[in-house]
Every structure is written in structure tokens, then in C-alpha cells.
């Protein structure tokens, strides 16, 4: 499996630990930087990772910044990306199994390299479990990423809200 990874200057050491971990497990790692502690901007690296995954150059992306919030927002702007900011196993597995996440985001200063590696290992062994319901949700997410008239439609999520009201839809 080819894995794209990127970070900002705040978490270069944590990213390198994750890269070493992935290589030790036999994964091909595409490191999009940054490679040092010189101040830089996380959107650059989120975009690079997202483009690698969206183009098929990588099968999974990992984005890391100090809190994870900034780089995860950046990577999610790349069409075709479904990234989840996670800090625990439950969120990571849900992201993969239910939403077929193709990028995972971390706050390296919050989660730390050891927990990141544990979460990544679990994620790599998890598989998307398609269902009619999550296929529809993923389609709605994909629909939102492109500008279209339906985005301003106040009933865009009506189908899901009605199911919720009837007790048919559960988190």
C-alpha cells in the first residue's frame, strides 16, 4: 500500500516517527514534507497529500499539524477527499468502516507519535463496510464538495432528518 504523509513544521519529529513506523511495517511512504522545523504553512502539505490520494498516487493519506484542525480542513478542500481528524481508535475505525475515509488527520502535539502509530495500524487493518445507508451519506458528502444549486436547497438533508425523526436512523 502506498501512503502519502504531510505535516507542518510543528510536528516534523512526530511525522518522521510515523514514517519510520510505516516503513518498518513494509508500507511505501510518499513523504510530502515538511522536512525540518522552519516555519511553514499546513495548507501546502494538506493539499499535497490530498492531491496524491485523489489522483491515485497513494491509497491513504496522513496529515499532521499541531492540533490537526488546520491541516485537516485544508486536505478536505481537495475534491474526492474524505478526511477525519481523530484522536482515538473509535473515531478512526468509524471513519474508515462507515465513511470510507481516505485521509486521516492528527494533532501531533495532542495525540503523540505512539498513539498515532497504534491508531494508524488499526486503521490499516480496518475495511470499509458498505451499506445502503452509508453509501447514501458518502454520496451526499461528495455532492457537497462541488458547487451546485442543491447546496442551497434547505431540504438537502431532509431524507436523513426524516429518518432520524422516525427513529429509523442511528449514529
From Swiss-Prot:
Membrane spanning residue stretches: none
Catalytic EC class: isomerase
SUPFAM superfamilies for this protein: Ribose/Galactose isomerase RpiB/AlsB
MF (Gene Ontology): galactose-6-phosphate isomerase activity; ribose-5-phosphate isomerase activity
Keyword Acyltransferase: no
Annotated S-S bridges: none
UniProt keyword Isomerase, yes or no: yes
Biological processes, Gene Ontology terms: D-allose catabolic process; galactose catabolic process; lactose catabolic process via tagatose-6-phosphate; pentose-phosphate shunt, non-oxidative branch
Catalytic reactions of this protein: aldehydo-D-galactose 6-phosphate = keto-D-tagatose 6-phosphate
Keywords: Isomerase, Lactose metabolism
Superkingdom of this protein's organism: Bacteria
The protein's annotated pathway: Carbohydrate metabolism; D-galactose 6-phosphate degradation; D-tagatose 6-phosphate from D-galactose 6-phosphate: step 1/1
The protein's Enzyme Commission number: 5.3.1.26
InterPro entries: LacB, RpiB_LacA_LacB, RpiB_LacA_LacB_sf
Family named by the database record: Belongs to the LacAB/RpiB family.
Assembly mode: Heteromultimeric protein consisting of LacA and LacB.
Protein's name according to its UniProt entry: Galactose-6-phosphate isomerase subunit LacB 1
